[in-house]
């Protein structure tokens, strides 16, 4: 069963492109995308390999960086965080680094990205209530301007990226 360990750095002789050219590896990735907790024996059965062979392939995909990790998805509302928002931040002069540090220090900020455009950061914030969301925003207002958008519903839930097409079989 896949675990949450961090993948090892890519070995010099492993090329993500060559691994992705293999249709069996693409099938492994598709199955893991549907169910990251699948047992290696079941994964092997689905792609036509033994458990040790499919385990080795999955580990190679991890080592070369194609598989970046396995993640647990939690329901924020079930954990007491029904308020979800995206917040854009435009730092004041000289405050760029401080915004990134502040975002990293606030547990309710679950993602923060440096972006192009008028704002410099976009982040995902969860809170138990609007007043607590406002308290998070107030921390950023010390260092710049914020623009927030409360999430009403998810039109598309997080999902795996599309995989490259399998190459045609060699003749």
What spans do the regions from the language model cover?
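A compositional/biophysical signature of low hydrophobicity enriched in polar/charged and small residues
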Residues: 1-171
């Amino acid at each position: 069963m896949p675990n949450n360990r961090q993948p090892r750095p890519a070995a010099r002789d492993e090329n993500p492109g060559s691994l992705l050219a293999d249709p069996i590896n693409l099938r492994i990735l598709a199955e893991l995308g549907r169910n990251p907790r699948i047992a290696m024996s079941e994964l092997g059965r689905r792609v036509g390999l033994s458990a040790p062979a499919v385990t080795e392939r999955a580990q190679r995909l991890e080592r070369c960086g194609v598989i970046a990790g396995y993640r647990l998805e939690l329901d924020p509302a079930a954990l007491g965080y029904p308020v979800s928002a995206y917040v854009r931040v435009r730092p004041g002069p000289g405050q760029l680094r401080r915004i990134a540090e502040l975002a990293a220090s606030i547990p309710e900020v679950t993602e923060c990205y440096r972006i192009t455009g008028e704002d410099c950061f976009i982040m995902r914030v969860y809170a138990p209530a609007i007043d607590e969301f406002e308290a998070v925003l107030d921390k950023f207002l010390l260092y710049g301007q914020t623009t927030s958008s409360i999430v009403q519903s998810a039109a598309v839930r997080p999902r795996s990226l599309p995989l490259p097409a399998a190459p045609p079989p060699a003749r």
